[in-house]
């Protein structure tokens, strides 16, 4: 009995302390915060995130409380931006203020203590690695130089589809293999024996790192950090990742050059590592972190976008017919089409843009407001975690007619690009932290998609109709399909 009373006293004391701390923190906040839903003591608005994917739940909140909404998630104060206007102000007008990232357990473990580029803080290291990326690694010129790799891997994929003619094929799995092979050969100069294991690890990491860990939301609690089960799972994954990447890098050192005779991405990183004039020297972990960036941002996102594009075209047969007609007319007689050839495919570009609007590769873009500022009339305190809901902006009826409908033809009337200039459509982000690999990513989406539309017609398995297709998403940084895309390919006969 005494023990029970003691526990009650302890629990009451702890809760009282947490409530008082919560009120003390609230008293330090400015008065002109963005609108906010009613919150609970201690947990704040955490209970509102139940029952759906984060981008869906946050859209519901901003639809009710305004395009700029303030949330308290545990101890952490966050702001959600769900309009083109507020996002433009944060990512363009106030870009240096919002160019930072906030730390999380997932990024610190899997991305080498954020010693990469995607999750790096806004500092000299980030500026340096981004400059290398833009000028040396993923420039438009280098993207074109990887053309033969795309052609080679597309030929492999086409052979797989041909061998499955008339039978159901797991298109998601085969497209992911192709995307992984392209990135692996561009990074390491050759196909590597464990690249399949790395691809599986990327999927697992993206799924786990996309969640809201309690230890991240209560950073002052050593107990929650100690009890965080996912932290230990991520640490085991990090060990597997180290083994794979260390093996890749050792294998890379013994070969003389990439398969195209020049430098691959790892060659460039090693060369830069030896440069004694660099402000922030590149470490071995920095090289591994950047390689994991390339795989996580370049493999899964490209593959996911192709899968969503094919899914939407299968669900909208009239759009499929139009896309195939254009591809087959413009690419007729071209044996190995690449980036220059697909530039002529206006409708294909619209299909890709519409796919990225509905299924952005990064539904939520994280930023950190490093100093107090004002966005659309509201005060954003310093060190506020900021989430840009790209998924919600792409489905906002204020910018898009029939926003939930897949309609590539809308871009005949509305001229918007996907490279960060038009804030109604920012699948790759915008401002200083716009994705530096967007040209590489677009090439690895448009070229394979064009060839898949050129060479094959498609049916759904058994008695399934377009209306039966499951278009659900599953949790993950890249917004992947919940279920794999299963299709029946038929070789297109131009004379039939």
UniProtKB/Swiss-Prot annotation:
Q: Which InterPro entries match?
A: CYP450_71D, Cyt_P450, Cyt_P450_CS, Cyt_P450_E_grp-I, Cyt_P450_sf
Q: What induces it?
A: Induced by drought. Accumulates upon root colonization by Myrmica ants (Myrmica sabuleti and Myrmica scabrinodis) concomitantly with jasmonates induction; this leads to the production of carvacrol, an attractant for the phytophagous-predaceous butterfly Maculinea arion, whose larvae initially feed on Origanum vulgare flowerheads before switching to parasitize Myrmica ant colonies for their main period of growth. Strongly induced by Spodoptera littoralis, a herbivory insect, thus triggering the production of carvacrol, which exhibits insecticide properties.
Which superkingdom, per the lineage?
A: Eukaryota
Listed under GO biological process in this entry are:
defense response to insect; response to insect; response to water deprivation; terpenoid biosynthetic process
User: Which reaction does this enzyme catalyse, per its entry?
Assistant: gamma-terpinene + 2 reduced [NADPH--hemoprotein reductase] + 2 O2 = carvacrol + 2 oxidized [NADPH--hemoprotein reductase] + 3 H2O + 2 H(+); (4S)-limonene + reduced [NADPH--hemoprotein reductase] + O2 = (1S,5R)-carveol + oxidized [NADPH--hemoprotein reductase] + H2O + H(+); (4R)-limonene + reduced [NADPH--hemoprotein reductase] + O2 = (1R,5S)-carveol + oxidized [NADPH--hemoprotein reductase] + H2O + H(+)
Any one GO molecular-function label of the UniProt entry: monooxygenase activity
Going by the record, the broad EC class of this enzyme is oxidoreductase
EC number(s) on file: 1.14.14.-, 1.14.14.51, 1.14.14.53
Q: What is this protein called?
A: Cytochrome P450 71D180
Gene symbol here is: CYP71D180
